[in-house]
């Protein structure tokens, strides 16, 4: 196999670089001189022919590409730096690579900027243009800030002179889009409305009227009581005179009868009714005492049963019908809410005979009254009475429990 030394390779590379620089600068190109390369037969094998690329290959390929592009596309437009629009529209995603041919001004709003021709000696041959893609594959014109120029293909070229005749508007700094400041709505801090109430009116007048009415009632009661006492005294005196008539002997002259105003019987009836209503049922529980007027409807010496788990449809009649087969049955009542009138789910049944009480506890416990089975137990209504509570407290004190 033919092998080259490092010096020969370096010489070939320098020669190729010199020819390439001459082609780029546009100078005359010397005919290519192919030096004879000594071939050293290291082994008795067939020599390997290595193709050598000539220096004019680049120019020939470039000319063929230019001729082909001229038949497909017209003369290339002069490169114009795209002007920056006053108000940039929303950004569009830019493809990874867009040729310079496709970077044309959109909408015809950009004016082509002319620049002076560079010196003939420094111009570089135009690069071959690729054939344009079909219309279906054409990318939409990209609107946005100007892209930096693409790097040249191939070895680096010499320094280029500054381009003259450029429009200063095209190369000016991009104008910042002035946005109208957002309208700031002022925050209003509002205090809570103050309510002015009228000063409380003194109730001295009402209190005075109430006191006067109370005094009138008390005076009327006192007058009634005095009249009743006088009537009772007259009756007693009449009885004494009757007993004196039975005595034998001289009798004293009878005194003249004293005319007393007749007393209304209605006042006496009211007094008796008030004396009967003096009886109160005071209950005590959790350190609180109150008067329970509902206990006055029941007899104090009866045998009472507590009936629990009653349905909403059970009333006094249904409960009385369930226990009316016992001969000593007295009363049945379902406890209801005073405000709404709904049942509280329990009630009471009373008997006069203790035997009927025991039979009802044994037979009716768990029976259906309405839509639910009834639950019975002994009523402990006496344990909450004030007298019983005080008696129990005294007994506990004697025993030393409290």
UniProtKB/Swiss-Prot annotation:
SMART domains listed in its UniProt record: RRM (SM00360)
SUPFAM superfamilies, sorted: RNA-binding domain, RBD (SSF54928)
Keyword Metal-binding: no
Gene Ontology terms for molecular function: mRNA binding
Basic and acidic residues bias: start-end ranges: 256-275
Superkingdom of origin organism: Eukaryota
Keyword set includes RNA-binding: yes
Location of region: Disordered: 240-275
Any Gene Ontology CC annotation: nucleus
One Pfam assignment: RRM_1
InterPro entries, per the entry: Nucleotide-bd_a/b_plait_sf (IPR012677), RBD_domain_sf (IPR035979), RBM42_RBP45_47-like (IPR050825), RBM42_RRM (IPR034215), RRM_dom (IPR000504)
Coiled coil (UniProt feature): none
Key words, A-Z: Cytoplasm, Nucleus, RNA-binding
Domain RRM: 303-381
Location of the protein in the cell: Nucleus; Cytoplasm
GO biological process, one term: lens development in camera-type eye
Classification via PANTHER family: RNA-BINDING PROTEIN 42, TRNA SELENOCYSTEINE 1-ASSOCIATED PROTEIN 1-RELATED-RELATED
Role noted for this protein: May bind RNA.
Protein family: Belongs to the RRM RBM42 family.
Protein name (Swiss-Prot/TrEMBL): RNA-binding protein 42
Organism in which the protein naturally occurs: Danio rerio
